[in-house]
Amino acid sequence: MLYYIIYIVCSSFIFASEFSFDTLWGQCTLVNKSSLSSNNIKETIEQEIQNMYESYGSIPLNNFSILIDNNHVQSSKHPHWKWSLGITYKNPDKIILKDPAISKISLKKFKKVIAHELNHIMLNRTQHYHTIPRWFKEGFAMKIADEISMYHKLKIASNTNKPSLFHLTNYSRFQGMNKEEFHFAYALSSASILLLDKIYGNRTSDRIAIYLIDGLTFQRSFYNATGFQIENFYQRFYNEIKKNFFWFKFINLPKNLFAIMPLILIIGFYMKSYRNKQIIEKWELEEELEKIDDTNIN
């Protein structure tokens, strides 16, 4: 904690580093207001773009900028900034990343955030980007950035008894959400991508992205990749969620058992005491009966 306090104080004296460089997607202007190495960030950007270029092909060239911000000014401009690690804008293409010293994430995690937001740039440059539902955009970006974790799976599992939360069409846009709803929407988005690849075959989400880049709408891309209309996925979604995520609840079972262990011990103590009392009463009754028998014999 002391490190972050010192950093925040000192960061006000750090001058922004700004320079431009060419990429496979066009010229990138990097504005770095953090203490991170600009050259290392540049290399990460170039590598992630190269990876997506090799996997999904070329996209229209256009200039874009990436700002690493070390203050909270953006929170007044974007309602989700205080919960986000990065935000991507279109027209013009711009990524704003929260300084990892403020968000308190590791450099490894920060590089994943870069990959996530660059993925948004890629899909935003498709001809029919406006047809892509938000759940697919976020889930696919999380997959590419390797951000899908056990946390997201447990969050889904803990809500499988609430069917109203799993109407996937409600997540075409993320609007009017509080913090809890916002994080659940991301968990649901990650689950949707996992289920797409499980139900319709490995790399289904990748094939959808390729069709999008080729100029098709999301609905047509989904059909070409799966052989089904998108409604098929919407109808199956909740049942597939229950079937594939319910068992994750049991991962928390040891922790839950530990929490109620004192109650279990108390109940066990009283059950044991009651049983012992019954045994003692039985022995006493047998002794009384033996005494009666002895008296009758005499």
Regions found by a protein language model. Give the residues of each.
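Sec-dependent N-terminal signal peptides
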Residues: 3-13
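C-terminal single-pass membrane-anchor helix
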Residues: 245-298
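Juxtacatalytic substrate-recognition/specificity segment
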Residues: 17-129
